[in-house]
Amino acid sequence: MKSYSSREVIAMLKADGWELVSTEGSHHQYKHPTKKGKVTVKHPCKDIPPKTLKSIAAQSGLAFQ
């Protein structure tokens, strides 16, 4: 799996319609107007661990290569 930075992941979420709803410390939470749940992304983070990317993919419905 390719390594992604938090900036890249956030850009993908925003492009898919996710909106920032909350920030607590270094954790940003995003909510989609039609999809269920929230997605939390640690920002800034140069390389998000693969297991975290899998979790973000499952929550958001996005595919990371």
What are these model-derived regions, one by one?
Residues 1-24, 31, 35-65:
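Basic nucleic-acid-binding interfaces
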